[in-house]
Swiss-Prot record:
<dbReference type="InterPro" id="IPR023165">
    <property type="entry name" value="rRNA_Ade_diMease-like_C"/>
</dbReference>
<comment type="function">
    <text>Specifically dimethylates two adjacent adenosines (A1518 and A1519) in the loop of a conserved hairpin near the 3'-end of 16S rRNA in the 30S particle. May play a critical role in biogenesis of 30S subunits.</text>
</comment>
<dbReference type="GO" id="GO:0003723">
    <property type="term" value="F:RNA binding"/>
</dbReference>
<keyword id="KW-0963">Cytoplasm</keyword>
<keyword id="KW-0694">RNA-binding</keyword>
<keyword id="KW-0949">S-adenosyl-L-methionine</keyword>
<dbReference type="InterPro" id="IPR020598">
    <property type="entry name" value="rRNA_Ade_methylase_Trfase_N"/>
</dbReference>
<dbReference type="GO" id="GO:0052908">
    <property type="term" value="F:16S rRNA (adenine(1518)-N(6)/adenine(1519)-N(6))-dimethyltransferase activity"/>
</dbReference>
<dbReference type="InterPro" id="IPR029063">
    <property type="entry name" value="SAM-dependent_MTases_sf"/>
</dbReference>
<feature type="binding site">
    <location>
        <position position="15"/>
    </location>
    <ligand>
        <name>S-adenosyl-L-methionine</name>
    </ligand>
</feature>
<dbReference type="InterPro" id="IPR020596">
    <property type="entry name" value="rRNA_Ade_Mease_Trfase_CS"/>
</dbReference>
<feature type="binding site">
    <location>
        <position position="13"/>
    </location>
    <ligand>
        <name>S-adenosyl-L-methionine</name>
    </ligand>
</feature>
<protein>
    <recommendedName>
        <fullName>Ribosomal RNA small subunit methyltransferase A</fullName>
        <ecNumber>2.1.1.182</ecNumber>
    </recommendedName>
</protein>
<dbReference type="InterPro" id="IPR011530">
    <property type="entry name" value="rRNA_adenine_dimethylase"/>
</dbReference>
<comment type="similarity">
    <text>Belongs to the class I-like SAM-binding methyltransferase superfamily. rRNA adenine N(6)-methyltransferase family. RsmA subfamily.</text>
</comment>
<dbReference type="Pfam" id="PF00398">
    <property type="entry name" value="RrnaAD"/>
</dbReference>
<keyword id="KW-0489">Methyltransferase</keyword>
């Protein structure tokens, strides 16, 4: 069976350490009754341990060479190997609208986009695990006051409990990346309603962190208008990295009450 050559433009770094693959596979065990979707299986190093769990497993892979390899290596998965771009998929159709666990050795170049899609489908994904760049994992798990605390931290922690599980050395990949990796698990918290307008919440989080050196007074003024009395609140003396998720929710409610003009659509705010 011909091996697949990693493609740089797809951000492929194939995992070759079986112990690490087994450890990643075991992170899905917190939801033993749910089906599993693996993103970016490559040559199936992680897949081989997922299928042993005797659960419905589907894999989605955009690389046609990897798909051909998987179909030959895992004939029992034939009907569940999906050649597609995960970011463009309708996840409602995957398991007939039922929830599932998301996992994978995620490509570095789209990991943030994967997690934004997870947030858009949070009612379908009660648990997301997998391996990403260590720096991104630290950002997601960071708390207020940390230099790595940012947009992903707040948006994900609003809906998920984040666990930084373990760090992975560069040498367990082919080719070795230039940075370390980490395995994380994100589990849906008890939040059903955010307690504020979710679109405005997202807009405020992105707007303030895109100007993270400014105080909230200066970063929010373009939204509220320079003469809005709300900016006299002491909260506006803080910078975004000083605010907890709950404080961002409180801020969103204050801004919503003060707004006199239509809100700029979130789609026009640039992703990090």
């Amino acid at each position: 069976m011909k091996l697949v050559k990693p493609k740089k433009f797809l951000g492929q770094h194939f995992l070759k350490d079986l112990k690490v693959a087994q450890d990643i596979a075991d992170t899905v065990d917190t939801f033993p009754d749910l089906p599993i979707l693996e993103v970016g299986p490559g040559m199936g190093v992680l897949t081989q341990f997922l299928v042993k769990k005797e659960r419905l497993v589907k894999v989605v892979e955009v690389d046609y060479e990897s798909v051909a390899y998987l179909r030959e290596a895992y004939p029992s998965l034939e009907d569940n190997i999906i050649e597609d771009d995960f970011l463009k998929m309708n996840l409602q159709r995957l398991f007939d609208g039922h929830p599932f666990v998301l996992t994978g050795n995620y490509p570095y170049n789209i990991s943030s986009q994967i997690f934004f899609k997870m947030l858009d489908n949070k009612d379908l994904i009660p648990c997301c695990t997998g391996m990403i760049q260590k720096e991104v994992a630290e950002r997601i798990a960071a708390g207020p006051g940390s230099k790595t605390y940012g947009i992903l931290s707040v948006l994900i922690q609003a809906w998920y409990r984040v666990e930084y599980l373990f760090t992975v050395n560069e040498q367990v990949f082919n080719p070795p990346p230039k940075v370390k990796s980490a395995v994380i698990r994100m589990t849906r918290n008890e939040t059903q309603e955010l307690g504020c307008d979710p679109k405005l919440f997202k807009q405020i989080v992105k707007t303030t962190f895109n100007q993270r050196r400014k105080t909230l007074r200066n970063s929010i003024k373009p939204i509220l208008g320079k003469d809005c009395p709300l900016t006299e609140d002491a909260l506006f003396n803080k910078r975004p990295e000083q605010l907890s998720v709950q404080e961002f929710i409180h801020l969103t409610n204050q801004v919503e009450q003060a707004l006199k003009v239509p809100i700029e659509p979130v789609s026009q705010i640039e992703n990090p």
